[in-house]
A protein has these predicted regions:
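Phosphate-ester processing/binding pockets and catalytic centers
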Residues: 1-158
Length: 158
């Protein structure tokens, strides 16, 4: 029996009531889950910290896709980034280098036997569920997929 870790996160926003402006900025709500063997996780984490150092990032830095987009927008519009913006500290890297960091981060998964589960809600087509119910549906779907993977070899997921 092997032990696996599952990490889950979301991207995008969801609202029961959606204006045209909201739909333009948030056409999708996406939840992802990464399933990885615990032994592989240790190596992946070490390699990820080395990669962060290579790019001049702190160990605790988290790069969000919205940061990349916001940096791109501010630079394109030639506007100064306000000091209170979370992505201000990445201004010196710029969006292109952040995209390279993201690509290099994903490449770390290539030699590892990992599974990625994505659940996607099209906000333009989705019925008006409450945010809590939509989250439950996404998590239930992810959990079902993880359980199916674990049953193959009688493995354990945390």
């Amino acid at each position: 029996m092997s032990i696996f870790f599952a990490f889950s996160d979301e991207c995008g926003q969801y609202r029961t009531e959606r204006s045209e402006g909201f739909l333009k900025g948030s056409p999708f709500y996406v939840r992802s889950a990464l399933l990885i063997n615990a032994e592989n996780w240790k190596k992946l984490n070490e390699d990820f910290l080395i990669l962060k150092e290579k790019y001049g990032l702190r160990k605790t830095d988290e790069i969000k896709w919205s940061y990349v987009w916001s940096l791109h927008k501010y630079l394109k519009d030639r506007k100064p980034i306000p000091e209170d913006k979370e992505f201000k500290r990445f201004e010196s890297l710029g969006p292109e280098k952040l995209i390279n960091f993201i690509a290099d981060s994903l490449k770390l998964l290539l030699p590892i036997n990992a599974k990625i589960v994505l659940t996607i809600t099209d906000n333009r087509l989705c019925p008006r569920y409450t945010e809590v119910n939509l989250l439950k549906m996404h998590l239930q779907n992810v959990m079902q997929r993880l359980e199916m993977e674990m049953q193959l070899n009688d493995d354990l997921c945390v």
